[in-house]
Amino acid sequence: MAQDSVDLSCDYQFWMQKLSVWDQASTLETQQDTCLHVAQFQEFLRKMYEALKEMDSNTVIERFPTIGQLLAKACWNPFILAYDESQKILIWCLCCLINKEPQNSGQSKLNSWIQGVLSHILSALRFDKEVALFTQGLGYAPIDYYPGLLKNMVLSLASELRENHLNGFNTQRRMAPERVASLSRVCVPLITLTDVDPLVEALLICHGREPQEILQPEFFEAVNEAILLKKISLPMSAVVCLWLRHLPSLEKAMLHLFEKLISSERNCLRRIECFIKDSSLPQAACHPAIFRVVDEMFRCALLETDGALEIIATIQVFTQCFVEALEKASKQLRFALKTYFPYTSPSLAMVLLQDPQDIPRGHWLQTLKHISELLREAVEDQTHGSCGGPFESWFLFIHFGGWAEMVAEQLLMSAAEPPTALLWLLAFYYGPRDGRQQRAQTMVQVKAVLGHLLAMSRSSSLSAQDLQTVAGQGTDTDLRAPAQQLIRHLLLNFLLWAPGGHTIAWDVITLMAHTAEITHEIIGFLDQTLYRWNRLGIESPRSEKLARELLKELRTQV
């Protein structure tokens, strides 16, 4: 590494001397010498760029004080600038010198000077050889006109691209595909310059009629990286075009979201919601093609984690943000619901899509029964070889899992016989892989536990041990994992809603949380419950206070 640094310094001095000689005398011999050495000079520039991109602008100036002179001499040498490759690498190197947040007038002047050099290169790219003579004739100094020239040039190119997009098959008025491709390549190092935003947007939105993508992959990657790191801000229409035209960028955006969720605090849905909204993915997912890719990546995450509750909660929050974005979208641009969920019953999707807030609370029970009937029909009464299956129905259901979380509350708040439809809904939600016999067994176990809990709610005294004992009653066999999780959540709901449950809540949770995994599960349940109550406007000060106290105490222990 040290040897590479020494070699680069020696090469730097050699090429600085060469450029000075070429600059001082424009003779036939110097022109021939320039052409003879262009390929070697380009190789030096590539090495120079690899070194510069690892430094900040201040370090670059400290290490190479005359770097500006070297690049300027190269940029004003027509025999070097005549090569597209030279233009591209020179732009890359110049962008490494830009100070994103100038702290003094010197840094601001350097940025203005770089803008001027970039304008000169772009002028050469567009074959505007008369630009310099024209501005000199008007009496303007470079520092005055170059920033404005860059902005106007960008706006002109953006306008030309928009016209190109509108002209469609009118080949006489369309910009050549090679030129569009060249523009996208030149833009790569300029992506984070605010003045270039209109051109970036126009390139993304401009769709050619060519059978293959004409924009450079490096352009898509650079734009996507800048968006993810919040270095640029583009209209949603441009972001959607980016992710539609370049699938790897969409996949990287999803992976970037996953990384943020993994590195953040566990079981905090408010923070998850902020990350999801900040990603722009719910808004972009209003386009079915993007939604399907995003949903497929969620599906893979769910399968790889064996249905982890945290993944399910994240899918539910994403779906909630997506539905909100869908409601705000223009009605003229809306797609049929079937395009988002092609493997499930449209009538089931329509019912699940209803927001509980828009339904009177007195009708929640009836809606839950209707959801159960539709799901049961799709899962148990489907014809052989029909599209979808139990998993697809369950996968759709968990998108709108708020309905499932309401079932336990509805059962515990009613003194009537537990409706079979609601018992089936709970059994299916917690055990999607179960067959009919296993699901029926879970329903019997849950019904027995509910009976004991309702009886205990009328008792004058409750004990943590009694409640823990009840959790294992109603069956002569050991509870399977899905049933255990379901009954734990029933007990937690009972503690939050039953008048006597508040006094023994902590003791019961202490007995329940005998592993770190179950502790995290309880934390997730409490956080999700508070999040849902807040969203639905459910007011229960006593229950809410208890849930917050339990959540706070449990988080200190993990």
From Swiss-Prot:
Q: Does the keyword Transmembrane apply?
A: no
- Could you say what the effect of mutating residue 529 to A is? No effect on protective function from mitomycin C-genotoxicity
Is the Nucleus keyword given for this protein? yes
Query: Where is it made, tissue-wise?
Result: Ubiquitous.
Q: Which UniProt keywords apply?
A: Cytoplasm, Disease variant, DNA damage, DNA repair, Fanconi anemia, Nucleus
Segments passing through the bilayer: none
Output the Pfam families linked to this UniProt entry.
Fanconi_C (PF02106)
Task: Tell me where it resides.
Answer: Nucleus; Cytoplasm
Gene Ontology terms describing biological process? cellular response to oxidative stress; DNA repair; interstrand cross-link repair; nucleotide-excision repair; protein-containing complex assembly
In the record, the effect of residue 251 to A is given as: No effect on protective function from mitomycin C-genotoxicity. Loss of IFNG-induced STAT1-binding
Record annotation: effect of changing residue 64 to A:
No loss of protection from cross-linking agent-induced toxicity. No effect on IFNG-induced STAT1-binding
GO CC annotation: what is one? Fanconi anaemia nuclear complex
Q: Per UniProt, what does mutating residue 531 to A do?
A: No effect on protective function from mitomycin C-genotoxicity. No effect on IFNG-induced STAT1-binding
Biological role: DNA repair protein that may operate in a postreplication repair or a cell cycle checkpoint function. May be implicated in interstrand DNA cross-link repair and in the maintenance of normal chromosome stability. Upon IFNG induction, may facilitate STAT1 activation by recruiting STAT1 to IFNGR1.
Q: How does it assemble?
A: Belongs to the multisubunit FA complex composed of FANCA, FANCB, FANCC, FANCE, FANCF, FANCG, FANCL/PHF9 and FANCM. This complex may also include HSP70. The complex is not found in FA patients. Interacts with ZBTB32. Upon IFNG induction, interacts with STAT1. Interacts with CDK1. Interacts with EIF2AK2; interaction between FA variants and EIF2AK2 may lead to augmented EIF2AK2 activation and cell death.
**Illness association:** Fanconi anemia complementation group C: A disorder affecting all bone marrow elements and resulting in anemia, leukopenia and thrombopenia. It is associated with cardiac, renal and limb malformations, dermal pigmentary changes, and a predisposition to the development of malignancies. At the cellular level it is associated with hypersensitivity to DNA-damaging agents, chromosomal instability (increased chromosome breakage) and defective DNA repair.
Q: What is this protein called?
A: Fanconi anemia group C protein
Organism, per UniProt?
Homo sapiens
Query: What gene name does this entry carry?
Result: FANCC
